[in-house]
């Protein structure tokens, strides 16, 4: 079976590299990352390159628990907004313990590039802490690795991997290098509904995330 993570060391460049193909939240993958960061600190490497190109997502806990949490003594708070339409979306958010606010309270002064079309039909919004929901990082004291992080991205970066990119950019955790991501990382799990007559189930994005 092909490994989900690929690690390389470049001692002459004082840098190391890890490619993460999927956000699995697998304990074995997590241990490999924790050992990797500890090794970088022990060897005094200045740069850590995290390559998430082609990573279409998975579980956000993978990067929270094994990438950001272990390497930030105190994670700065970064608020994002998600726009909602309709009662069902609001009720779905409440299942996650998040209360929607009326759209009239959206701080437009913080969103100067927001397109008016994005607000059409929108009646409420959520404040998403660190891109998803209220996050409790398993912070390490001291952090496992204190060097500089670089995050490689492309257009296939989506969902859970996109939330890492958004969070890393807003918080300053890493310098992003590459292409614009595919999005859909700001928010929570897709809404699931079933048609009343056929019983066919479908899912769709819970809202529109704003970076």
Range-by-range predicted roles:
Residues 143-144, 169-170, 195-198:
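A structural signal for short secondary-structure junctions
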Residues 136, 145-160:
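Catalytic cores of nucleophile-dependent amide-cleaving enzymes
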């Amino acid at each position: 079976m092909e490994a989900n993570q690929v690690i390389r060391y470049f001692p002459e460049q004082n840098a190391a590299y890890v490619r993460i193909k999927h956000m699995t939240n697998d304990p074995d993958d997590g241990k490999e990352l924790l050992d990797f960061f500890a090794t970088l600190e022990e060897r005094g490497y200045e740069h850590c390159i995290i390559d998430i190109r082609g990573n279409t997502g998975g579980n956000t806990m993978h990067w929270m628990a094994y990438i950001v949490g272990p390497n930030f003594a105190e994670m700065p708070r970064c608020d994002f907004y998600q726009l909602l339409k309709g009662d069902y979306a609001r009720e779905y958010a409440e299942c996650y313990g998040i209360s929607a606010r009326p759209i009239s309270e959206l701080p437009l002064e913080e969103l100067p590039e927001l397109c008016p079309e994005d607000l059409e039909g929108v009646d409420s919004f959520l404040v998403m802490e660190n891109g998803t929901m209220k996050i409790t990082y398993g912070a390490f004291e001291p952090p496992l690795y204190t060097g500089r992080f670089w995050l490689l991205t492309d257009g296939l970066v989506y969902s859970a991997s996109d939330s890492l990119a958004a969070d890393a950019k807003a918080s300053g955790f890493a310098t992003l290098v590459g292409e614009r991501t595919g999005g859909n990382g700001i928010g929570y799990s897709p809404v699931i509904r079933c048609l009343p007559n056929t019983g066919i189930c479908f899912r769709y994005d819970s809202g529109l995330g704003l970076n």
